[in-house]
A protein has these predicted regions:
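N-terminal positively charged helical leader segments and presequences
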Residues: 1-97
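Conserved RecA-like P-loop NTPase ATPase core
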Residues: 17, 118, 126, 181, ...
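Structured adenosyl-cofactor binding patch, chiefly the S-adenosyl-L-methionine
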Residues: 22, 128, 146-155, 214-254
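RNA substrate-binding interface of SAM-dependent RNA methyltransferases
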Residues: 26-30, 36, 46, 57, ...
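Short beta->alpha connector loops at strand-helix junctions that form conserved
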Residues: 63, 84, 111, 137-138, ...
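A short acidic, often aromatic-flanked loop/helix-cap motif at beta-alpha or helix-coil junctions
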Residues: 65-70, 87-89, 167-171, 190, ...
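Short basic, glycine-rich beta-strand/loop surfaces that mediate nucleic-acid
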Residues: 70-84, 155, 160, 198-206
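Active-site/ligand-binding-proximal alpha/beta "capping" segment
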Residues: 182-236
Length: 254
């Protein structure tokens, strides 16, 4: 079987091999995830895992077949890192942006959006609508990879994207800071056109397959339903985000 043509590893943020990954960690490169060969007990891989975790990087144990599929050089030595295209922002960066604009915070929370195209499209929508930031969880989510950046049409460079260990814990923190949380849900308890999005608001967008996770949905102040008039009963993540965000824009302009 012919090998696929090697792609430009630098262009899509893939860093392969033990020395290259260790050097990237030492240099403080913004790394999205590190994939390690499952079951490999080599001390060098253990050192990489410990260093990564100490720096807050997500470490994923993957079988060698997955690493072989990801590899561009076919010499990954049991470790592949995927670099983030830019450093993650903090929650404070998002609040600061709202303060600088003299606006009530408008934040998008992405619950387990694992498809990078969906995440990129949501980030693009959020930036266009003037949201102050996007938040993703560290696990079970796409990160700021090259695919996400490309799908966002460059929006990742213009809006803060923060990454948190626990989305539910962050939601509770936002609530303490006076932010109302609205989750998009097919059978929501509030109609889109009855939701008051003029004040400090966070909009939660769940995954296309299963929507919001149970704990996230339970932590929302309101679950918001979008009127559906056709035979298809769901929208993709970026379309749902666009509808809620632009309803917030409409309310804030009027």
């Amino acid at each position: 079987r012919k090998r696929p043509p090697q792609r430009d590893a630098e262009a899509d943020g893939v860093i392969e091999g033990r020395n290259a990954v260790i050097e990237a960690l030492r240099a403080g490169t913004a790394i999205d995830k590190i994939y390690l060969a499952k079951g490999d007990t080599d001390s060098a891989l253990g050192h990489i895992a410990n260093t990564a975790r100490a720096n807050g990087v997500v470490v994923v144990n993957a079988d060698r077949r997955k690493l072989d599929e990801m590899s561009r050089t076919h010499a990954h030595q049991g470790v592949i890192a995927v670099a983030a295209v830019r450093a993650y922002a903090s929650i404070e960066d998002i609040f600061q942006r709202a303060e600088e604009r003299g606006e009530a915070p408008l934040i998008v929370l992405c619950d387990e959006l694992s498809d990078p195209h969906n995440l990129g499209a949501v980030i693009r929508t959020a930036e266009c609508a003037g949201a102050h930031g996007v938040v993703i969880p560290k696990r079970r989510s796409a990160g700021l990879t090259a695919i996400v950046a490309k799908t966002s049409a460059g929006a990742v460079s213009h809006i803060p994207v923060a990454r948190v260990p626990n989305l539910t814990a962050l939601m509770k923190e936002l609530q303490k800071r006076g932010v109302w949380i609205f989750g998009a849900e097919m059978n929501g308890n509030t109609s889109l056109y009855e939701a008051d999005l003029k004040g400090p608001a966070a909009i939660v967008i769940g995954s296309e397959g299963s929507g919001m996770s149970r704990l996230v949905a339970e932590t929302c102040d309101f679950t918001v339903s979008i009127p559906m008039k056709g035979k298809i009963n769901s929208l993709n993540a970026s379309a749902a985000a666009a509808i809620l965000l632009y309803e917030a824009v409409r309310q804030r302009l009027s």
